[in-house]
């Protein structure tokens, strides 16, 4: 058993392993998003066609949203495993 953290139910090695797996998956997917973002940004920078530029700009916005949602999804999954005790 791991030393307790205030506001959370007791942690176990199993719970820590699950949360580490969640965080590893988050990092891997985040790196894919970053690579796509760089690819689309470069394409936008070199684009002379306004319609294609609009599409690349939209893709950049979508990837920004995806990255934000990825962080949120990871946070909720970690909370599900660690089960915080809300006392307010």
Swiss-Prot record:
Keywords from the named record: Nucleotide-binding
Consequence when changing residue 82 to A: No longer inhibits host CapV phospholipase, 25-fold decrease in cGAMP-binding
Disruption outcome: Decreases the titer of this phage in E.coli about 50-fold.
InterPro entries found in the cross-reference section: Acb2/Tad1_hairpin
Impact noted for substituting residue 33 to A: Still inhibits host CapV phospholipase, binds cGAMP, about 50% hexamerization
Phenotype when changing residue 12 to I: Partially inhibits host CapV phospholipase
Gene Ontology terms for molecular function: nucleotide binding
A Pfam family of this chain: Acb2_Tad1_hairpin
List of residues binding 3',3'-cGAMP: 8-9, 11, 23, 79, 82
Quaternary assembly: Homohexamer when bound to 3',3'-cGAMP.
Similarity comment: Belongs to the Acb2 family.
Functional summary from the UniProt entry: Antagonizes CBASS (cyclic oligonucleotide-based antiphage signaling system). Binds and sequesters host-produced 3',3'-cyclic GMP-AMP (cGAMP) with a dissociation constant of about 30 nM; each homohexamer binds 3 cGAMP molecules with 1 cGAMP molecule binding to 2 monomers. Sequestration of cGAMP inhibits the cGAMP-activated phospholipase activity of host CBASS effector protein CapV.
Protein name according to UniProt: Anti-CBASS protein 2
């Amino acid at each position: 058993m791991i030393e307790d953290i205030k506001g959370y139910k007791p942690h176990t090695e199993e719970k820590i392993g699950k949360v580490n797996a969640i965080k590893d998956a988050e990092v891997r997917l985040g790196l894919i998003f970053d690579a796509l973002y760089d690819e689309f940004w470069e394409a936008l920078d070199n684009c002379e066609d306004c319609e294609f530029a609009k599409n690349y700009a939209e893709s950049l916005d979508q990837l920004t949203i995806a990255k934000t949602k990825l962080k949120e999804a990871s946070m909720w999954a970690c909370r599900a495993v660690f089960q915080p005790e809300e006392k307010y």
